[in-house]
A protein has these predicted regions:
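Short coil/turn connectors at secondary-structure junctions
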Residues: 12, 39-43, 81-87, 109-115, ...
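Flexible, low-complexity linker and terminal segments
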Residues: 2, 11-12, 202-334
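Conserved thiamine diphosphate
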Residues: 3, 84, 132-185
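Active-site diphosphate/adenylate-binding microenvironment
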Residues: 6-67
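Thiamine diphosphate
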Residues: 51-125
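ATP/pyrophosphate-binding catalytic subdomain of soluble kinases
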Residues: 166-223
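Short beta-strand segments
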Residues: 46-48, 90-91, 115-120, 195-197, ...
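Glycine-rich beta-alpha junction loops
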Residues: 49-51, 121-123, 174, 197-202, ...
Length: 334
């Protein structure tokens, strides 16, 4: 049992709009950290720019509110320099996938041991309502008054395309599931991407309405758990089966279908094919997948860098710059 409580991680008074999903997520992060039990002074929360990027101010840990889109780059440097530090990187969909998109995919590709949280409300909130890389085609905003004419990024596709080893998804208002995803991300060694679906009550209210309430999730979402059959519905009456190279929804009890026929979720499968199909499911034909979709272990960038440094040091006469300066072959200029 952890020696820390939620209060040990709280700091300051959050200054977000009433009803903003950031409030719910902050509570989930405080709770997850208290259950994980890592001391606050061993944690750094690093963010970019945006509404969600104010989060480090409300954490009683080390924090760094950095520059637009560069949270992943700065978090990378911090982790490589101090591998014992637990790092939570916080970005919004605009900050993380537009100006920060390149940093995002390369941090994932390199498999740096970061907990990368993407708070996705499908809008630029801090700059007052422009469409973001995750806004739907046709979305009307201040920067697209006649509707966007482009398709959005889907974070799971970016993650898997960058050889991502961990991807989870939760809803900001679902405290229990969000805490579970955050704890799983922290336990995973490597780049852990958690997409948090949240609401912006001012500029994009209702963007995740189909699953934002408990009743909505019962009808329109599926909670994935490793080793368990993929069953969903208000009465757990539906399941997922494979059909060719795709998936199909079936009703348990019809046409002789039983729970034994339902696909069992394997989050640890190295192949991304099924994980991607699950992550891209959308209504009304399919439920939206929540929970840990992918969790595969692999060597991390930071471990590989430090192993390489030690190997090279073993082959050299001098093991550090300080040792080099302290040899007899130095002089003083007066």
């Amino acid at each position: 049992m952890s020696e820390y409580t939620v209060q040990d991680y709280k700091f300051g008074q959050p200054r977000w709009c009433p009803g903003c999903g950031d409030h719910s997520f902050l509570g989930a992060l405080h709770k997850a950290m208290s259950e994980i039990g890592i001391a606050p002074h061993n944690i750094a929360v690093i963010s970019g720019i945006g509404c969600s990027s104010r989060l480090p101010y409300y954490m009683n840990t080390y924090g760094f509110h950095t520059i637009h889109g560069r949270a992943a780059a700065i978090a990378t440097g911090a982790k490589v320099a101090n591998p014992d530090l637990t790092i939570w990187q916080i970005s919004g969909d605009g900050d993380g996938l537009a100006i920060g998109g390149n940093h995002f995919i390369h941090a994932v590709r390199r498999n740096i041991d970061l907990n990368m949280i993407l708070l996705n409300n499908r809008i630029y909130g801090l700059t007052k309502g422009q469409y973001s890389p995750t806004s739907a085609r046709g979305f009307v905003s201040k920067s697209s008054p006649y509707g966007t004419v482009e398709d959005p990024f889907r974070p799971a596709e970016l993650c898997f395309g960058a050889r991502g080893r961990f991807f989870a998804r939760c809803v900001a208002t679902d405290m229990s599931a969000a805490v579970g995803c955050l704890k799983a991300a922290a336990q995973h060694k490597g780049a852990s991407v958690v997409e948090v679906l949240q609401n912006c009550v001012i500029f994009n209210n209702g963007t995740h309405d189909s699953i934002y309430t408990k009743e909505g999730r019962a009808k329109n979402a599926i909670y994935l758990e490793h080793g368990k059959p993929m069953i969903f519905g208000e009465n757990r009456e539906y399941g997922l089966m494979q059909e060719g190279f795709g998936l199909k929804v079936v009703k348990i009890g019809e046409n002789g279908i039983t729970e034994q026929d339902i696909l069992v979720h394997d989050a640890h499968c190295k192949d991304t094919t099924l994980h991607l199909k699950l992550a891209l499911m959308e209504g009304p034909d399919f439920p939206i997948a929540l929970g840990v979709i992918r969790d595969v272990e692999d060597v991390t960038y930071n471990d590989a860098v430090h192993a390489q440094v030690e190997e090279v040091k073993g082959q050299k006469k001098y093991h550090s710059f300080t040792e080099l300066l302290e040899t007899n072959e130095t002089w003083e200029i007066k």
